[in-house]
């Protein structure tokens, strides 16, 4: 259990970096939905083509998350994060000039690459710099990540409307990404001796627990990617405007941010996080069931329920992965692998939902698919008992592969 002593004042600037980095990892995804009609009309992307704007970044977040431990060992965490944030800024800036579907997909790939590297490396930095406050700082990081999603959904139509140009509604995101790169370069600690994250990753891939965490993270985030891609178009089909449907997505993201920040604090009072994970899954199930059965009854409430469930589950999933190992490099490697496999899984549901929509003329089947995924994750998390962490990661016959190390104090 985490100690409750206060964070040193010297870490305040580093916490600002945590917040600003998290803020930049979702706007480029959530900003597309409210502008989907305009983007589709100019680039020629159909419903399944628009789904690729979510699928491609998610795939890259998965593929390059596996490379995170090796990048950190070879280039260092600080250099990797700064370079990735610069790539995020460039990808958003290039959206000022895209005119075709392929160009739009190219920027999505560039943005997914930048976000993937940050997400793979950054949890290890949190574990290293704040070992006694992993839950609190991970909650802040996750909350800002979700808050960035709200910002993207809200600002994209607001900036695009007066400019009468959807390009501006997406390209403005280059500014906070560049600011985050500059602040990270100045404030993140210098890279020291290379750590053993790459070797740990190879060993962890042999553990069934790693694959279980991947499956849980992927199925839950498949719900997130589906909602981000199709909640606004879903309500556009019900007669909502771009701004109002984007506002609904922003409400969902705000609820995500609040839950991502608050639930880790509440869950930190006990070692077993599963009751809180099951609570978040119940909220997701209620939200998706409501979208399927009564979408117009209380849209704001449905969006808030989904957001709270998705945001809280994301944050707690990250903490559970970091809880498994005391060493920052090894814990970061496990988190990167969980995200790698997870995002590969999460990339597919938006495209599947688009395909089902083309076949049935409705998003109903897509919402029902997410209910099945939630039921699966609820059962899988039953096996993630904190008493099993040690044996699941370091079986008695293989403990020499991952020697126990002690994290530095913050």
Where is each model-derived feature located?
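Conserved MFS/SLC helix-loop-helix module at the cytosolic interface between two early adjacent transmembrane helices
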Residues: 63-102
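Helix-to-loop junctions at the C-terminal end of transmembrane segments
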Residues: 64-76, 259-272
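Extracytoplasmic gate region of multi-pass secondary transporters
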Residues: 32-33, 208-250, 255-260
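Helix-loop-helix hairpin linking two adjacent transmembrane segments in secondary transporters
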Residues: 132-136, 140-189
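Cytoplasmic helix-loop-helix junction between adjacent transmembrane helices
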Residues: 107-143
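A late C-terminal transmembrane helix in Major Facilitator Superfamily
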Residues: 325-364, 370
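Intracellular juxtamembrane helix-capping segments at the cytosolic ends
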Residues: 117-130, 312-326
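Helix-breaking motifs and short loop linkers at transmembrane-helix boundaries and internal kinks
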Residues: 44, 76, 97-102, 131, ...
């Amino acid at each position: 259990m985490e100690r409750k002593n206060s964070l040193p004042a010297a870490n305040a600037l580093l916490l600002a970096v945590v917040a600003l980095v998290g803020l930049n990892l979702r706007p480029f995804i959530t900003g597309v939905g409210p502008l989907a009609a305009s983007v589709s009309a100019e680039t020629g992307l159909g419903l399944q083509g628009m789904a690729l704007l979510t699928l491609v970044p998610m795939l890259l977040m998965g593929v390059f998350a596996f490379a995170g431990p090796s990048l950190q060992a070879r280039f260092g965490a600080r250099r990797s994060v700064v370079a990735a944030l610069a790539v995020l800024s460039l990808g958003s800036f290039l959206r000022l000039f895209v005119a075709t579907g392929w160009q739009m997909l190219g920027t999505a790939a560039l943005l997914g690459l930048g976000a993937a590297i940050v997400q793979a490396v950054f949890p290890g930095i949190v574990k290293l710099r704040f070992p006694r406050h992993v839950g609190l700082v991970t909650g802040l990081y996750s909350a800002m990540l979700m808050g960035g999603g709200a910002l993207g959904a809200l600002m994209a139509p607001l900036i695009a409307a007066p400019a009468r140009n959807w390009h501006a509604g997406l390209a403005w995101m280059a500014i906070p990404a560049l600011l985050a790169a500059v602040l990270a370069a100045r404030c993140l600690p210098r890279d020291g001796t290379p750590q053993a994250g790459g070797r740990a990753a190879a060993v962890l891939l042999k553990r069934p627990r790693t694959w279980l965490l991947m499956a849980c993270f992927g199925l839950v985030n498949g719900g997130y990617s589906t909602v981000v891609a199709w909640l606004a178009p879903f309500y556009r089909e019900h007669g909502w405007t771009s701004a109002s449907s984007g506002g609904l997505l922003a409400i969902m993201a705000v609820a995500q941010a609040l839950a991502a920040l608050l639930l880790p604090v509440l869950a930190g009072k006990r070692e077993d996080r599963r009751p809180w994970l099951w609570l978040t899954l119940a909220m997701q199930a209620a939200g998706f069931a409501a979208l399927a059965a009564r979408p117009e009854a209380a849209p704001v409430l449905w969006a808030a329920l989904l957001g709270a469930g998705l945001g809280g589950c994301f944050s707690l999933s990250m903490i559970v992965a970091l809880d498994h190992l005391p060493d920052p490099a090894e814990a970061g490697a496990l988190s990167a692998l969980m995200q790698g496999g997870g995002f590969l899984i999460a990339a597919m549901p938006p495209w599947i939902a688009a395909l089902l929509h083309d076949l049935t003329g409705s998003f109903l089947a897509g919402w029902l698919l997410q209910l099945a995924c939630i039921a699966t994750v609820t059962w899988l998390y039953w096996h993630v008992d904190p008493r099993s962490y040690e044996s699941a990661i370091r079986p008695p016959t293989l403990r020499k592969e991952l020697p126990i190390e002690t994290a530095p104090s913050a």
